[in-house]
A protein has these predicted regions:
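Catalytic machinery of carbohydrate-active enzymes
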Residues: 1-376
């Protein structure tokens, strides 16, 4: 006769439904070897991270996981993320639960207990979620009963001020990783971004090379010419990308065009030039496949995009271009070069520009080519 004893003090038990081991494998509590007793020890913490988006921000925020596991080795970590950005967290060995914001989050927060809630977002939805976890220690940002933002320490307060005043953002000299590490009280700020590579995706990437007759010995320059839907001004000139592609094609390198559906216009325009050895990686890749194709590259040229954070996390050399957003905020871990436009109004954080030549147009292809040649 089965024994239906419930270990309600197990970290894996979600309270209102079967745990994953019971649901997927039919394992009973009495026979389960995954039992983890809830403990109040310093090491064994239940941690909730709230970082909904954007996708690049979610990806670069994964660096905090190293520090959290260093501080709390036996911790259980859950992450609330916007459903459209969840793919960058999948297969991350440090995350026990990925919760998307299309679920019943209020019910989830009421029925699950956390020792620490880390909210790195200032969006109202994120602040409200942190507020619902009122029995936990909140690091980062939450709301008080009067809907005022509460910053957990002086570093969080300064980040809040930079979010409200572009002048402060422009004068910032520290990376995002530095600020978040201080907000979360991590031992250091140079933990790496985590970009999981899946075996199946890597195999598909190698098949992509074989299909296109690309030898493994060939040096590959990845070019991500887009900048997403929101920040059109972060794009470099199409002429600059074409000149750069032509230069490295003549040198015998492979140029791999990287991007998603939103980058098809730029990618197709470059392909129309019929430059030898310039190939599209495709614009309909899964996130896992996209990561694996970035991993094929020796050096990546891009703007301030998700592809940048992925390339950095994969320890690629990057040459990255900046105009309306902060060059100082971006961490590349001493692997590559950052190039900034030449305008007094640089780091304006505007999404529209009425100047005849905007800041990104002041970046010359020769400067970019010279930078890439240091690594390729």
């Amino acid at each position: 006769m089965k024994n239906f004893t419930i270990n309600t003090d197990c970290l894996n038990f979600p309270l209102d439904r079967p745990c994953s081991y019971q649901k997927n494998d039919g394992i009973l509590c009495e026979e389960c070897n995954q039992y983890k007793k809830i403990s109040n020890s310093q090491e064994n913490k239940r941690i909730l991270i709230i970082k909904l988006g954007a996708m690049g921000d979610v990806l670069r925020s994964t660096f905090v996981l190293w520090g959290l596991k260093e501080l709390y080795p036996k911790s259980t970590i859950s992450w609330i993320v916007d459903s459209k950005n969840a793919a960058v967290l999948e297969h991350n060995a440090f995350i026990n639960n990925i919760i998307t914001n299309d679920e019943n989050l209020s019910n989830f927060l009421i029925n699950n207990f956390f020792d620490i809630v880390i909210n790195l977002d200032l969006a109202f939805e994120s602040l409200s979620l942190a507020k619902l976890s009122n029995k936990a220690k909140v690091m980062g940002f939450t709301l008080d009963d009067n809907r005022n933002i509460v910053a957990s320490n002086d570093f969080a307060l300064q980040w809040l001020k930079m979010s409200a005043y572009d002048e402060l953002k422009k004068n910032n000299h520290f990376t995002y990783q530095h600020w978040m590490a201080q907000i979360v009280s991590l031992p250091k700020d140079n933990y790496e971004i985590i970009v999981p590579l899946q075996k199946k995706a890597q195999e598909k990437a190698l098949n992509f090379l074989n299909t296109n007759n690309i030898a493994l010995s060939k040096k590959i320059l990845g070019i991500n010419p887009g900048a997403g839907k929101r920040w059109n001004l972060k794009k470099w000139t199409l002429e600059g990308f074409i000149e750069t592609a032509k230069h490295f094609s003549k040198k015998g390198n492979i140029v791999l065009l990287l991007g998603g559906k939103q980058d098809e216009k730029e990618i197709n325009a470059i392909l129309k030039e019929n430059i030898p050895d310039v190939i599209s990686a495709g614009t309909n890749n899964t996130i896992s496949d996209f990561f694996a194709k970035i991993n094929l590259c020796d050096t990546v040229l891009c703007g301030d995009t998700m592809a940048l954070h992925a390339a950095v996390g994969l320890k690629k050399n990057v040459v990255t271009l900046f105009g309306p957003t902060s060059i100082n905020e971006i961490e590349i871990y001493s692997r590559g070069l950052k190039i900034q436009g030449k305008k007094d109004c640089i780091t304006c954080y505007k999404q529209e520009c009425y100047l005849e030549n905007n800041c990104m147009q002041t970046i010359k292809s020769r400067e970019v080519i010279n930078a890439i040649e240091k690594y390729l």
